[in-house]
Every structure is written in C-alpha cells, then in structure tokens.
Amino acid sequence: MTLHRTTVTKRLFALLASTSLIMTMGACSSANETQSHETDSPSTATATDAGNVVIFTPSDGITISQQTPLSKWEKLVPEIVSSLKDNDVKGANITVKAAPSLDKQSQSVQDYVVNHVNSTSDDADSSDKTTLVVAPVADTTESDRQYGDYVSHAITWNGSSSDEDAQDYAQSAERLVSALQLAQNEGMKVVLVSNTLQGFTPDVYVPMTTAEQIGQLQAKQLVSKLELDKTSSDNPKHIEVLLPYDAANESGSTADATFAQGVFKGIWSVLGPYFKDGKAVSPSGTLTSSSTESDWVSVAFDAAKSERVKSTLAGRLGMDKDTSRHTRIDGIISCNDYVAGYASEELNDLGYTGSAADINPSITISGIVDNITGKKDLKKQSVPDPAQAPESDDGDSDTEDTSDSLDEQNSQWPIITGYGAYVSSIPNIVNGKQWMTALENRKTLASDIAQTCVCLLYTSPSPRDRQKS
C-alpha cells in the first residue's frame, strides 16, 4: 500500500517573501555513526503493550557547506516518536537506529530481524507485534543532499557490475531486502519511508517529495509571480535555470543523474510552453523554444563550491568579464537554497538592486479599505508590462540618457526561487532577495508515519496467533 500522492502535496508548502513566518527551530546535532537507543517514557493507563516500533533511518547527510536545510532526519525522528506516544505506543516499545551508509544500515536491520526471530522462537508465550519503519540510505551526491533529507530516491543496483564499489553497494542492498523479506515472512510489518528498494514490496510505502515535484513547485511560483500568462512574446520574461549536478560521486565514479533530471523535468513541464510560445527566453541561450526535458544538461553545473555558483550565473548573464552594463533577468530558478543564496550574493556584487517585493505587487482601493478594517492584507496592483521590450520601442535609443535608463531597468532584482528552507536563507526571504523556498511539513509527515504504524500494530497477528494458525 502506498499513501496517496496528494498527501505529499498537502505536506509540501512554500514560504514566500511576502509571508509572515513564525518558526520554532530546535538545536542541531550530528550523527556520524550507527546509533541505537530506546526512548523511555513513564507508562500510562492508556499506553499499549500491543507491539514494538523499530525505526531505521540514515544519519543526517553532511554537506561541505555549513549551510544546511531544516529537513533533517535528526529533526523528524523525535517527531515520529512523539506522535507514536500520542497514539498510545509506549516509549519503551519504540527503538531508533541510525546509520551513515546502506552497508551499516543493512547489517543493523539484519541483526535486529534475526535476533527478534530467534527470541520469538525461544519464547512460546511471546505476543509482541513488530513494525519496522525503514528509510533506506540512498547513495546521494553533494548536490542531491543540498535539497535536504526529505526527498524520495529510487534505490537500484546492478548485481553483475564489474565495478567494486557497485558490487559492494549491491551486496548491501540485497542484504537489506533479504532481511526485510524475512521480517515479513515472520509476521513483522514493514513501512518504507521516502526511498523505494528495487525488488521489494513493503506493507506500506510513505513517499516524500520527489525531484519532479521540487522543480514543478518552483516553476509554478515563478510563473505566478512573473504573470507569464499575461506576458507578450514581444516583451518576454528573461529566465535562467541553475541546476546543480555532480558529474562524479565521492568515489570518482559517474554519478547518477536521475535526481537532477527529475528536477528539470518538473521545471520544464511548467516553463516549457512559455519558452515555446516566446513568452520566456534565456539570456544565455541555454534554453530555447525548441528545448525539451532531455536538455537538462545544458543548464546543469557543478555547485559543490560557492564560487562555481557565482561564476556560472555571471557567465549566463554575460557579465563575467564586463560588468559595466547589466543584462536583464526577471527570474532565476535556483533549485535549492544553497544555490539561491550564492546567486543572490552574485547579483548583489554585480550591482542589481531592489527586491522581489518590487515585482508585480498588487494594491487596490478596495484593498486599502479592507486593510484598514482588518479584513485582509494590503496588496498593490502592478503596472502592466509594455507590449514591447523597452529596447525595441521607437525613438532615439543612442542617447546617453536612454542607455542609462535602460541599464537601470535591466539592473532590477529578479525573482529567485529555492528549496530546503535553509536557516541561512530566511533573512533573504524576509528582505525579498529570495522569493520563495519550500519544505515538508514535518509534524504532518511524522503523524502520517505514526498513525500508519499504529494501524499495522492493531491489524497484524501476533507471533503467538501465527503459531496457533
């Protein structure tokens, strides 16, 4: 069973520059090796001894940059535990184990399942039911980790590969699948979270945000803010896509491009029609009216270092050598907050001014009245774009005043989108330098997982019942 996809859509929400945010942030801690601990809480009259929940998650991914997203496993797991307790599962019946690699995780799951099966066989009176919650450790690149931990990956492998690293990975993955299949055969329930496993069908799959959804969300926000539906092909919007992608992983092998391709697929499913109709253009020419989702590589770049982000954007704008005149840019899809932050820095260094708040605001007379009476926020109506781009209007465009005026227009700050809700990105969102970010609703996600576990505990037969049957 898979939790319905709309559940993910409801959990995923965007934080916009115009939104008033109240956020509670917990202290951060790192987990660099396998950890196991039982969560203790006083027994209550309502708590149930109906079964155990064992949670296996990755240790938090470590990025080279100190900038990290809020969507970390170390923040989600306590929420799941808390939600399980709220659903009357005893703290003593909840176990959490974290591992930094698929190899370590597969061994941890295998050890638990084998030990549990042996102890159940030795204890004829055992009536414990067990649900395993497993978020398989994905082999991700640095650029993939920039999106945070709450994103879905399909874990696949080639068992016949001649590459030694690939063989080790396949062995770990197959060990995990075998352990989970043994668990199911012994009556345990398995809930897979976020990542799928090649050749394994869990009792329940809880999806998280996909790469395609990340791309779609940002593109839709950009289309809405720039009002592309009202844009004329004679005065198109100038848009760049900065797609982070590591061509090689940490071991030097060719990296899996699936995630980067998925992000661009989502972006292009929204922006493609506007480029085709001429309502959107790319200043760098990396995207054209004939581009397809297969052209993702044209906008991909290595974003492991901040200077690469900045130099790539300057190059796209043709300002890597000459910064005397600005290139018009209306929107930048940065894909994640790491890229968005350095894109904002570079635009500031290049002399772009203003903020996202200056683009298509909307204030009306009725809005002023409603604002005074407290019915709704004040919104400013935007001035319509001219039918033609300023540089194509009639008149003497060779004068110095006209040139300066055009450069002033071109230097206006663009819409910048991101993803991951980095703590470091919040100031940019507040001051309008970054238009939006997004993240999963952690509490809702934890509640979904906890309620699924409770349902499985109450509906699955106990080991004693299975022996009788």
How should each PLM-predicted stretch be described?
Residues 149-166, 176-212, 244, 425-428:
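Flexible loop/hinge segments that line or gate small-molecule binding clefts
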Residues 28-36:
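Bacterial lipoprotein signal-peptidase II cleavage site
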Residues 131-150, 166-182, 294-409, 414-424:
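Hydrophobic alpha-helical
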Residues 68-86, 104, 214-218, 255-286, ...:
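Short, solvent-exposed amphipathic alpha-helices that sit
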Residues 49, 173, 177-180, 206-238, ...:
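Hydrophobic alpha-helical segments within soluble ligand-binding/sensing domains
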Residues 458-467:
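Conserved small/polar residues in nucleotide/adenosyl-binding loops
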Residues 161-171, 198-224, 251-259, 431-443:
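Short beta-strand elements at the ligand-binding edges of bilobed clamshell
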Residues 42-83, 87, 93-120, 135-140, ...:
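Extracytoplasmic "Venus flytrap"
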